[in-house]
């Protein structure tokens, strides 16, 4: 296992110095899900939630969150993202909204945290917009599924 890079020699937190690293194309994909009651799921699917189009708002929230990741996660570098996309899959059998984010940049450090943040905030937005009718929703399985670029190369999660 690689040493933890966010700590100095005395164990104090630090932001890693990436100034000597070269720019490379980087991409990360993350996924998560929101499980809900069947009636809630149908209302999300059919656009019948009082607060508005749940998936459209969640998509925008996820994109905005990816752009603000360094404001939320203390040791993340502020990045110039070149692309953020969120995709939703409606799983009617399990009353679940599956969320996938894809984040891209060309830079000195990866975009894994931005992809994970996008999924997390999109999921929380779905919860927020539907909580009046379903407080039993479950946000789960937020995970990195793929990353490319940088020193560690290409990673694909085995699912």
UniProtKB/Swiss-Prot annotation:
UniProt-listed Enzyme Commission number(s): 4.6.1.17
Q: Where does substrate bind?
A: 75-77, 113-114
Which pathway is this protein assigned to? Answer: Cofactor biosynthesis; molybdopterin biosynthesis
What is the enzyme's class at the highest EC level? Answer: lyase
* Active site as annotated: 128
Which reaction equation describes what this protein catalyses?
A: (8S)-3',8-cyclo-7,8-dihydroguanosine 5'-triphosphate = cyclic pyranopterin phosphate + diphosphate
Q: What does this protein do?
A: Catalyzes the conversion of (8S)-3',8-cyclo-7,8-dihydroguanosine 5'-triphosphate to cyclic pyranopterin monophosphate (cPMP).
Family affiliation: Belongs to the MoaC family.
Q: What are the UniProt keywords, alphabetically?
A: Lyase, Molybdenum cofactor biosynthesis
Q: What is this protein called?
A: Cyclic pyranopterin monophosphate synthase
Its GO biological process annotations read: Mo-molybdopterin cofactor biosynthetic process
Q: Where is the signal peptide?
A: none
Q: How does it assemble?
A: Homohexamer; trimer of dimers.
Q: What GO molecular-function term can you cite, just one? A: cyclic pyranopterin monophosphate synthase activity
Question: Which PANTHER family does the annotation name?
Answer: CYCLIC PYRANOPTERIN MONOPHOSPHATE SYNTHASE, MOLYBDOPTERIN COFACTOR SYNTHESIS PROTEIN A
């Amino acid at each position: 296992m690689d040493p933890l890079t966010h700590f100095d020699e005395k164990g104090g937190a630090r932001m890693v110095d990436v100034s000597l690293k070269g720019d490379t194309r980087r991409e990360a994909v993350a996924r998560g899900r929101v499980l809900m009651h069947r009636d809630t799921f149908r209302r999300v699917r059919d656009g019948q939630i009082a607060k508005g189009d749940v998936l459209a708002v969640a998509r925008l929230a996820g994109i905005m969150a990816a752009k603000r990741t360094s404001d939320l996660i203390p040791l993340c570098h502020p990045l110039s993202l070149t692309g953020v996309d969120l995709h939703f899959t409606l799983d009617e059998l399990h009353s679940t909204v599956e969320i996938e984010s894809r984040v891209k940049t060309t830079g000195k450090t990866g975009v894994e945290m931005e992809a994970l943040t996008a999924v997390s905030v999109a999921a929380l937005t779905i919860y927020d917009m539907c909580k009046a009718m379903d407080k039993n929703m479950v946000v789960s399985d937020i995970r990195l599924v793929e990353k490319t670029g940088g020193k560690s190369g290409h990673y694909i999660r085995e699912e």
